[in-house]
A protein has these predicted regions:
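Short, linear, compositionally biased motifs with a strong N-terminal bias
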Residues: 14-15
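Short N-terminal helix-initiation segments at or just after the protein's N-terminus
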Residues: 1, 24-27
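A general boundary/transition motif marking the beginning of the first structured unit of a protein
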Residues: 1-2, 94
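N-terminal signal peptide c-region/cleavage motif recognized by signal peptidases
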Residues: 18-20
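Bacterial N-terminal signal peptides that target proteins for export
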Residues: 2-11
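N-terminal, post-signal-peptide region of Sec/Tat-exported proteins
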Residues: 48-80
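A short, Trp-centered hydrophobic/proline-enriched beta-strand micro-motif
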Residues: 26-44
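Mature, soluble, non-transmembrane domains
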Residues: 23-25, 37-39, 50, 70, ...
Length: 158
């Protein structure tokens, strides 16, 4: 009896270790300052712009700004990526039901790992060009984030 309990504990520990090791392999790594081009499509409308995310020891803070410099929304992301809070949402999107869907989609997007992700109404895909796309089929929303290469860092490295 004791031997089988030990085996069960050892097996469950190995499974837990394997899943936590894979959990750190996120599609969107957030270290320091990250910049992405972003496109959010919803039923014939599209919001395009830039997403800037800064990460420190307390978590991540981000902003989505359109081409004209208007803040669409700001957000915070906890260090373990399990909590997303929307701040300063543009008036068109400042409805509780819209914020609830966007908050859930962003949480799902930032928690996505390198393995194929599809959960119910949400699907995350990694494109060949390095962009990450989330599709919410229930509400017909599509989020696309493509990393912006920092040319200033490339020039200083040479």
């Amino acid at each position: 009896m004791e031997r089988s309990m030990r085996r069960c504990l050892l097996l469950s520990s190995l499974i837990w270790l394997a899943t936590t090791a894979l959990a750190g392999d996120y599609l969107l790594p957030l270290e320091g300052r990250q910049q992405f081009t972003v496109a959010i499509s919803a039923r014939g409308m599209e919001l395009t712009g830039v997403c800037i995310i800064k990460t420190d020891e307390t978590g991540s803070r981000g902003a989505i700004v359109n081409e004209f410099g208007v803040h669409a929304l700001d957000f915070t992301l906890s260090q373990n990526r399990k909590k997303v809070k929307l701040l300063n949402v543009i008036d068109v999107m400042n409805r509780w039901y819209i914020k609830k869907v966007v908050r859930g989609d962003l949480k799902y997007l930032f928690q996505a790992t390198a393995s194929p992700q599809s959960k119910g109404r949400r699907t995350v895909m990694l494109e060949d060009d390095g962009s990450v796309t989330l599709e919410n089929t229930k509400y017909r929303l599509r989020y696309s984030l493509k990393p912006i290469k920092n040319t200033q860092d490339d020039e200083t490295a040479e």
